[in-house]
Amino acid sequence: MEPLVAELKQKIEDTLCPFGFEVYPFQVAWYNALLPPAFHLPLPGPTLAFLVLSTPAMFDQALKPFLQSHHLQPLTDPVDQCVAYHLGRVRESLPELQIEVIADYEVHPNRRPKILAQTAAHVAGAAYYYQRQDVESDPWGTQHIAGVCIHPRFGGWFAIRGVVLLRGTEVPNLPPTKPVDCVPTRADRISLLERFNFHWRDWTYRDAVTPQERYSEEQKAYFSTPPAQRLALLGLLQPSEEPSSPSQELHITTLLSKKPQNPRRGWLSPTVSPPISPGP
C-alpha cells in the first residue's frame, strides 16, 4: 500500500474503528469500470476513496453512546444520524483535504442511487458481491435475483454505510485488493442467493460463512422493526405522539441496559422481496 494511503487509512481508522466501523481504500476508476456511465462517480480515475462498513459492534460502541448524547435533534433515523455524525468526524479530522461523504442511502433527484454500495464494497476488497452471474447455469429462469455481499469474517452480519471521496488526492499506483471469495461453490452460491431473495427476513443468509460475530437479539429486534416505528421502539417519540402497538412502548432504557432483550417484542412478517442492499 502506498505510504499516503496507509497514512490516511490509519487516520480514518483512528476516528472510526473504535466505534465498530471498518474502512477499505479503493480507486474511483475500479468502481467506474464495473458500471455504466450513468452510475459513474464524476472524479478522475485515480482519485482515492474509502469504503466504510459497520460491524455488529457498532450497535453498542456507536449507536448506544450516540443516543445517550445530545446529538439527536431533530429526530429522523437514529442509525443514519449516528453514522452521519461519525462520518462527519472523518471530515473534521482531515480539514486539509477535500472530502465528500456519500451515505449508502443517498439518491439523486431522479432517485438514482449516488453510490452502488455493494459494488464499492467489492472493488475495495471489503466483501464479495455475489450475483446471479456468479452461478453457472443458474436455476431461476425469468425470476429477478438480487445480489448480496458477504464479508469473510462477519458473513452477512454487517452493513455498508457509505464512501469517503478524497477530491484532489490521486493514487495511481494503489494496487487493487480482491475480495475474499468465501462462498466458492455453485451449490453454496445458489443457497445464499435463494436465502437472500426469498427468505431474507429469517436472517439465515447472513450465516453463509461462520461469522466471528452476529447481531445481538437486541439489534435484530431493532432492525426488524419498520423504520417509521423505530423511534417508538427506542422510546424516542415526541411527547404529543402515542405509540401504536405494545412493542413501541419500550423505553430507551431497555435498549441502553445490559439486560437481555424483552422477549415480547414482535417480528415483522416476511415481505415479497429483499432490500436493494443487504442492510442493515
Curated annotation (Swiss-Prot):
Main location group: cytoplasm
UniProt-listed InterPro entries: MMACHC
Any single Gene Ontology cellular-component annotation: cytoplasm
Region (Disordered): 256-280
Cofactor: binding comment: Can utilize both FAD and FMN.
Catalytic activity: 2 cob(II)alamin-[cyanocobalamin reductase] + 2 hydrogen cyanide + NADP(+) = 2 cyanocob(III)alamin + 2 apo-[cyanocobalamin reductase] + NADPH + H(+); apo-[alkylcobalamin reductase] + an R-cob(III)alamin + glutathione = cob(I)alamin-[alkylcobalamin reductase] + an S-substituted glutathione + H(+); apo-[alkylcobalamin reductase] + methylcob(III)alamin + glutathione = S-methyl glutathione + cob(I)alamin-[alkylcobalamin reductase] + H(+); apo-[alkylcobalamin reductase] + adenosylcob(III)alamin + glutathione = S-adenosylglutathione + cob(I)alamin-[alkylcobalamin reductase] + H(+)
Listed cofactors: FAD; FMN
GO molecular function: cobalamin binding; cyanocobalamin reductase (cyanide-eliminating) (NADP+) activity; demethylase activity; FAD binding; glutathione binding; oxidoreductase activity; transferase activity
Ligand binding (substrate): D104, I115, L116, A117, Q118, Y129, Y130, Q131, C149, I160
Keywords: Cobalamin, Cobalt, Cytoplasm, FAD, Flavoprotein, FMN, NADP, Oxidoreductase, Phosphoprotein, Transferase
Phosphoprotein among keywords: yes
EC numbers, comma separated: 2.5.1.151, 1.16.1.6
One BP annotation, GO: glutathione metabolic process
Subcellular location: Cytoplasm, Cytosol
Positions where Phosphoserine occurs in the chain: S245, S247, S273, S277
Assembly mode: Monomer in the absence of bound substrate. Homodimer; dimerization is triggered by binding to FMN or adenosylcobalamin. Interacts with LMBRD1 and ABCD4; the interaction ensures the transport of cobalamin from the lysosome to the cytoplasm. Forms a multiprotein complex with MMADHC, MTR and MTRR; the interaction with MTR could modulate MMACHC-dependent processing of cobalamin. Heterodimer with MMADHC; the interaction might play a role in the regulation of the balance between AdoCbl and MeCbl synthesis.
Record's function text: Cobalamin (vitamin B12) cytosolic chaperone that catalyzes the reductive decyanation of cyanocob(III)alamin (cyanocobalamin, CNCbl) to yield cob(II)alamin and cyanide, using FAD or FMN as cofactors and NADPH as cosubstrate. Cyanocobalamin constitutes the inactive form of vitamin B12 introduced from the diet, and is converted into the active cofactors methylcobalamin (MeCbl) involved in methionine biosynthesis, and 5'-deoxyadenosylcobalamin (AdoCbl) involved in the TCA cycle.
Protein family according to the UniProt entry: Belongs to the MMACHC family.
Protein name in the entry: Cyanocobalamin reductase / alkylcobalamin dealkylase
Organism, as annotated: Bos taurus
Lineage: Eukaryota, Metazoa, Chordata, Craniata, Vertebrata
